[in-house]
Amino acid sequence: MTTVDLPLLPLGRGIDRASERGVECPGDLPPASDPDLVARALAAKEALGERLFVLGHHYQRDEVIQFADVTGDSFKLAREAAARPDAEYVVFCGVHFMAESADILTGPGQQVILPDLAAGCSMADMARLPQVETAWEALAAAGVQDSVVPVTYMNSSADIKAFCGRNGGVVCTSSNADVALEWAFDQKGGLDAGAKVLFFPDQHLGRNTAVLQMGIALEECVVWNPLLPGGGLSAEELRAAKMILWKGHCSVHGRFSSAVVDELRATVPDVQILVHPECQHDVVLKADLVGSTEFIIKTIEAAPSGSVWAIGTELNLVQRLGKEHPDK
């Protein structure tokens, strides 16, 4: 894999999350306090045999992935866990909402274990149930709730998913967001009948899907800010909108800017830009291809030898793809 030194957006833990500039990249892991840690972990895994099933999310480091029985995105891994009813212990190497999803789909005799209970997703944390319920009540007060279907991204907490279920909504993934939106609009008679979607927690996935795949105008997408009264929107703006996007974002994909895309095209001959739909809209517009994590992986796998790619997604996945495809 070839790396190019380009001026990325500055990162840091102290940066306001609303800036979408991302979070600090922690760098290399420190040496294990126990030099025999890996050997002991592998021995324990072997001893437990089929009683143990380890799931590794694509975004994990190789030091973690080495223990995984299967790798994938959050939805794929949750389904894999459900398909292994004989596994007494399901260890999910991911973040909190992922383990929650697996726990929902697995049987009562299975234990889903999150190795680090503090492992969270900043985007999932941007849509809390009390905030969403307040927004729902505000939509009723504005006279538009009856036309709205709530749609949440897989990257959300279990209580947010349950809220959508209670209110006639649905959960989507980055792979099927367009299908989910089509279904949601149909529940209220379609776009021409004034149907609307309240989409959370990632505004960018919602906007990119609505505009680029559904043909909804950019000006028909408004952003609901849960930190402002009434979401910062007037009743007139809500009535005119087709997509009400929650003001949330991915702190990793928020790193990428259209300026970086321009710099890549100017400095790397024949580069193809491949990004995740959680990237900002102006980045997606300048990319050659956009798609889910699984789409990104399959695209690189199928790409011809010698092709040059710049991938706008999580670092560990990109580095792993580079190692697996050194000819590209």
Give a label for each model feature:
Residues 2-328:
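The feature marks the mature, well-folded catalytic cores of soluble enzymes
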